[in-house]
């Protein structure tokens, strides 16, 4: 999300003031009608409070995914039944206690329960805020779209990172059409590559830095340290490469190395009241009963729609969308600059939802294999653009994934440790070849240096003498 702790805090306090005022007004109106009705309203509020608390803390094991997968809400009818049962049981308990204890004692219990739950939630909030460092103001850098094809006639180091692409599935797609195999002529394919993390937030900083996330520090501290301590960035800087990261996720919080396409931006909501409503819905994702969660889940998109980043419309923020990347590729001319260039492009790859067919038409209900075909065609266009500009031979090119993917279980963290990895060194010319080297992302930092030194794609990992190279015809 683009917003920070202080924008959330401001919206939450305003929402709290609004709901608190409405609640006080409602209780006063109920008291004016009759004492019995006021007690009924108080009891109903207690039932709602306890139901939401149980929903948000004990009925969260079967939440719909947040990764863009299309949610079939009909599949969650069972969760609605659980919520209804909890609500009925709590209501029955409240009515029973009210009858047993009497009106005055029951009113005291309502106040005690409300204060107790409020205290628990407040302690949890403060603890999480302090331990995660969320309260600290940070500068986040965003990638602008232009300059993707401002490259060097000396040497380029280009990384195309495709999100969530499984090596074996990609290989099956390549084998299905000789044209796909021909796209990757001059490359070396590593089918036994072992990745690092199953999720993008951790794998991308690791790929670029070699620094593991041990869970002992706040994530943004880790991300900043990953940039600061990156062996790749240090080596590129020492060799005077111009470094640009085309990344749509705002995880870069350190500017130790000068990323030529990144800027610090001011952020604000377009219309504050709509943003405040969206923040309220975000809370409902966890605490609202399931029949309201579909409404609350829309807030994920709505908060992005309220993002005003104050950028020049002629140079918008970079997005990983595959079709937009292909469109921009056609629009931006290749230009040349002095010195060497490093360019990193994070693309949608095989991430859900599967929007495009093999011809990059928006269909909305495509398959994983069709999505991979679309990626291959876009990569082919990218490579052709380099060839037409006489920049292909002098470029190191890596086509890789941040992690693997299991199309049979899209939300599983398992079966994600075999990411795609294809590499071409400077000046290579041969059919697509396969290396059976037992390579791993743990070896990437040394591999990057070997590629900068002019090594071929089949000679960048240890144990090369144990490999068996197959040339794909």
What residue spans do the PLM features occupy?
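Metal-dependent active-site segment of extracytoplasmic phospho-/sulfohydrolases and closely related
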Residues: 158-159, 179, 374-415, 428, ...
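Active-site His/acidic residue clusters
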Residues: 125, 328-374, 406-419
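Transmembrane and membrane-interface helices of multi-pass
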Residues: 1-136
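Short beta-strand segments
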Residues: 245-247, 342-349, 369-372, 396-401, ...
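Alpha-helical transmembrane signal-anchor/signal-peptide segments
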Residues: 132-147
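Conserved small/polar residues in nucleotide/adenosyl-binding loops
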Residues: 469-473
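Active-site-proximal alpha/beta segments of enzymes that process anionic O-linked groups
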Residues: 31, 36-83, 90, 94, ...
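Substrate-binding rim/cap in mid-to-C-terminal beta-strand-loop elements of soluble/periplasmic
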Residues: 192, 197-214, 408-455
């Amino acid at each position: 999300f683009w917003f920070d702790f202080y924008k959330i805090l401001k919206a939450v306090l305003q929402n709290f003031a609004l709901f608190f005022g409405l609640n006080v007004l409602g209780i006063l109106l109920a008291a004016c009608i009759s004492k019995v009705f006021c007690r009924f309203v108080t009891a109903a509020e207690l039932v709602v409070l306890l139901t939401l608390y149980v929903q948000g803390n004990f009925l969260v094991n079967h939440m719909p995914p947040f990764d863009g997968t299309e949610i079939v809400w009909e599949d969650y009818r069972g969760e609605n039944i659980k919520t209804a049962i909890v609500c009925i049981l709590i209501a029955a308990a409240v009515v029973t206690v009210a009858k047993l204890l009497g009106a005055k004692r029951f009113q005291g219990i309502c106040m005690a329960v409300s204060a107790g739950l409020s205290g628990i939630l407040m302690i949890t909030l403060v603890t999480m805020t302090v331990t995660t460092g969320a309260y600290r103001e940070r500068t986040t850098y965003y990638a602008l779209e232009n300059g993707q094809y401002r490259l060097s006639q000396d040497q380029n180091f280009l990384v195309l990172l495709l999100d969530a692409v499984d090596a074996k599935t990609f290989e099956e797609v390549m084998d299905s059409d000789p044209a796909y195999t021909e796209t990757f002529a001059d490359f070396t394919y590593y089918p036994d590559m072992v990745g690092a993390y199953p999720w993008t937030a951790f794998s991308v900083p690791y790929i670029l830095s070699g620094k593991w996330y041990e869970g002992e520090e706040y994530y943004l501290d880790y991300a900043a340290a990953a940039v600061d301590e990156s062996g790749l960035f240090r080596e590129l800087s020492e060799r005077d490469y111009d470094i640009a990261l085309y990344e749509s996720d705002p995880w870069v919080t350190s500017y130790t190395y000068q990323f030529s396409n990144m800027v610090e931006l001011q952020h604000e909501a377009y219309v504050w009241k709509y943003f405040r409503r969206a923040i309220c819905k975000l809370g409902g994702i966890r605490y609202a009963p399931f029949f309201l969660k579909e409404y609350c889940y829309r807030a994920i998109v709505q908060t992005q729609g309220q993002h005003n980043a104050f950028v020049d419309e002629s140079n918008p923020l970079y997005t990983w969308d595959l079709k937009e990347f292909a469109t921009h590729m056609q629009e931006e001319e290749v230009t040349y600059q002095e010195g060497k260039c490093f360019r990193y492009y994070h693309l949608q790859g095989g991430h859900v939802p599967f929007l495009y067919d093999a011809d990059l038409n928006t269909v909305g209900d495509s398959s994983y294999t069709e999505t991979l075909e679309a990626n291959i065609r876009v990569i082919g266009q990218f490579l052709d653009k380099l060839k037409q500009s006489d920049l292909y031979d002098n470029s190191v090119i890596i086509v890789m994934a941040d992690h693997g993917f299991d199309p049979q279980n899209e939300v599983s963290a398992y079966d994600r440790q075999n990411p795609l990895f294809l590499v071409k060194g400077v000046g290579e010319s041969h059919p697509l070849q396969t290396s059976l080297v037992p390579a791993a992302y743990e070896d990437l930092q040394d591999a990057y240096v070997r590629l900068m030194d002019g090594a071929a794609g089949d000679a960048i990992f240890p144990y090369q003498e144990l490999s068996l190279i197959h040339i794909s015809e």
